[in-house]
Amino acid sequence: MIIDAIEAAFTRAKKQGWEKTYWLFDLHDTVITSNYGVGEVEEYFPFALETLKILSDREDIVLILFTSSHDEKIKVYMEKFKNLGINFNYINENPEATNSSYANFDVKFYFNVLFDDKAGFHPMKDWEPVYQYLIEYYGK
């Protein structure tokens, strides 16, 4: 399912002549396991970091952290990702997509691909195929 969304985003971008696609990433139960506030131990799902690194290194991909975490925790997460060479362009927003005659992004911002367990992403089975797909797609 997520591969279908990625392929559709790439196909549409190519057809429209877009230079970038916008990818949203939830944190808990998508990139990291949830601990529901018990301690600071969080584990990354297999292939999550490798996949995020590939995407972070691309100029044609915009990474958006999509989280309901508190600001203090977001700062901690962003620093951790930065130390791992993963850079999110935005947090809970996409200022690059502006309102037009056919779309209003004041409340719901624009994105192409959504990684969120609440949207059907299954981290234990979906990260590896996404990683493999990107390796093939980008020829790494």
Locate the predicted segments by residue.
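HAD-like aspartate-dependent phosphatase fold
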Residues: 1-140
